[in-house]
């Protein structure tokens, strides 16, 4: 058993970082924002990429989860329900691809979600954000005229509730077999356990069944009320059988990311009077500013480091780069300009990972040098790259992740600075130049963003359609369409209607769970099949300033 007392000094700093009185929520978007006339060309280019990508999927993989664009085949890695079709529906509607949407709708009406089409277990997290989120978003964007989309989403959620295996269980298991409604008894991570409430509360809204909100919201409440190393920042792994953390690893990256993301988004989309969600998010941000924020010794880039049992790890990831947009969004809702300004700095640092590579596309993971932290030891080539760019690549592939362009979209809508339009345009050019698989004319990932000759990754992710192309399209769209003051995005880029904003979100006082942080070993339950814990060997770095 590891016991780490929460630092008392945080409580003093939090008063400095937060406002001293409750401030009215500000609009997320700047008023009267308009895109220049040149935006139309880039928006059309995004539509063309969508059509080209989806045409390849339709020819070689229709009805299956994902296209393999190099091998001219498909993979069913999301239970064989046609993840790409469902995930892409909202983007089809926004782009006015009515025929494609009608085809997708016809397909979705025939899916039997009561059983998996593969022997695999069903992931609560992936199924919720892609399938449930995709169908509910399409229901709303199509004018709420296709009740079958709600019915199908309900069918899925009615199966997933069995992941709460016992009557008093508040955190679900992460995987379940639909054939016998039996969950896999394993440790969960807080992202997968805490990224259900936005979507499930929408299913409650359209069905009246409060159980969906009770279960999904209850998981978040449990995690938020567990004492953590720093207020608001939970460790990554949690045991659903006893509600105890299983590690002491803190990150805004994979395994924790969307739990933190949804705290403020759930407060906004529900307008709940319970300040727990906004205040816990505020606490997480304040803790991150105090404990995780680092400035690289070269380039002065602002990063959020990871933390593991008292050790700062100077590493970042594409997944974590959602944080800039999330801080901009939440900072605006809390009317906290400090949070917004730091969010914009995080956006800059993440964009630098794109601007620094041969392809103009950012890597999966990277490290950097900053005071007071440890990092993976760079080789000579990485060290030379760091001297020029202020970071070095540790995992070089690009698997069509959206987070950098997602945060770029938030920064554009919140500031009106056209540099964000220029960056989005450069990403379009890079995608057109480097991602096309000649075998299918579809779009693939990259094995090495800094060496195009390393070839393409043989996969077209469903979130290429749901997120990457949607965020790019909306960046060049009329800002009044899908305004950030009227809509909330789930972590898969699915768009949901939001009620008129409240006057105030949160109490202006970051919430800290009472008690002493405790963590245990994972002897009682198996870890997830693919643990999200970092695999990189971290050692003290003697290279500060190089």
Per-region residue spans from a language model:
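Glycan-recognition and catalytic cores of secretory/periplasmic carbohydrate-active enzymes
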Residues: 26-546
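Bacterial N-terminal signal peptides that target proteins for export
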Residues: 2-12
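N-terminal signal peptide
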Residues: 2-3, 16-35
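A positional/structural detector of protein chain ends, strongest at the extreme C-terminus
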Residues: 1-4, 544-546
